[in-house]
Amino acid sequence: MPNSLASLTPGHEASIVAVHAEEALHHRLTAMGFRVGKRIQLMRRGAFLGPLHVRIGSTDVIIRQRDARCIEIAL
């Protein structure tokens, strides 16, 4: 995958281009606000490849690294 949410640097923003996940995970990510075209900002990373703190609009979400790798972004 070209650029995933997992590769974003804290403090930077990006747009969601696609969500490459199996159906159940895709539905869960969509329900949390990860939709194509949305602007997101990575707030911080957990230690030792821990979860990511992401801001989508005015909503803060914590997401696992492996799930973040399913979200393709464009800077």
Q: What are these model-derived regions, one by one?
A:
Residues M1, A24-R28:
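Short alpha-helix capping/helix-loop boundary micro-motifs
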Residues N3, R45-L75:
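C-terminal structural segments of small proteins and small subunits
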Residues T9, H27, A47-L49:
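Short, solvent-exposed coil/turn segments
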Residues A18-E22:
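A structural micro-motif recognizing beta-strand termini
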Residues A31:
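Phosphate-coordinating loops and pocket residues in cytosolic domains that bind phosphorylated ligands
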